From Swiss-Prot:
One Pfam match: Ribosomal_S5_C
Cross-referenced Gene3D superfamilies: 3.30.160.20, 3.30.230.10
Protein name stated in the entry: Small ribosomal subunit protein uS5
Origin species: Rickettsia akari (strain Hartford)
GO BP terms in the entry: translation
Transmembrane segments: none
């Protein structure tokens, strides 16, 4: 099996957070910078990474490399939204992701918006509950994205055909 070389030119990069951190040593304080970056190809692949260095640009570069290593493929519905609603948690942060109709747009706050823009999602509604810490929210969002499954993958897991597991609202009969 040959590895497919990733085209790094098409990756979009969003700097989500930069902090100045301090290490106290015997001779005083040593300052450094920590950066958190989200990268994606706007076609269903996204990753996030953290980097720390003496300079902001070095920290950003390390974070970008870490994000590229942690990239994941997310199944998208019609290349614009997610297949189903999902909840993700990380510590005290909880994130609810809901699929949306075409034309809705990205309704999400803060760091979640950066993930969806890098992922290539055009229609989604996201709500964060609990902690609004950037790291916790991104972790919770990735937890939710990991739980997503396409109808094709669900059908394969259940040894069924896709049309056997998909339920259309017109197929539901109501007894009156």
């Amino acid at each position: 099996m040959s590895k497919v070389k990733k085209n790094e030119d098409t990756l979009s990069e969003v700097l989500v957070d930069v902090n100045r951190v301090t290490k106290v040593v015997k001779g005083g304080r040593r300052f450094a910078f920590s950066a958190y970056v989200v990268v994606g190809d706007k076609a269903g692949r996204v990753g996030a990474g953290h980097g720390k260095a003496k300079e902001v640009n070095e920290a950003r570069g390390k974070a970008k490399q870490a994000a590229k290593k942690r990239m994941m493929k997310v199944p998208l519905y019609q290349n614009r939204t997610i297949h189903h609603d999902v909840v993700g948690k990380s510590g005290a942060a909880k994130v609810i992701l809901r699929r949306a109709k075409a034309g809705t747009g990205v309704i999400a706050g803060g760091s979640m918006r950066a993930i969806f823009d890098s992922l290539g999602v055009h229609d989604i509604v996201a709500k964060s509950i609990g902690s609004t810490n950037v790291y916790a929210m991104i972790s919770a969002t990735f937890d939710a994205l990991n739980k997503l499954a396409s109808p094709k993958s669900i059908a394969m897991r259940r040894d069924k055909k896709v049309n056997e597991i998909s339920i259309k609202s017109s197929d539901i009969q109501v007894n009156e």
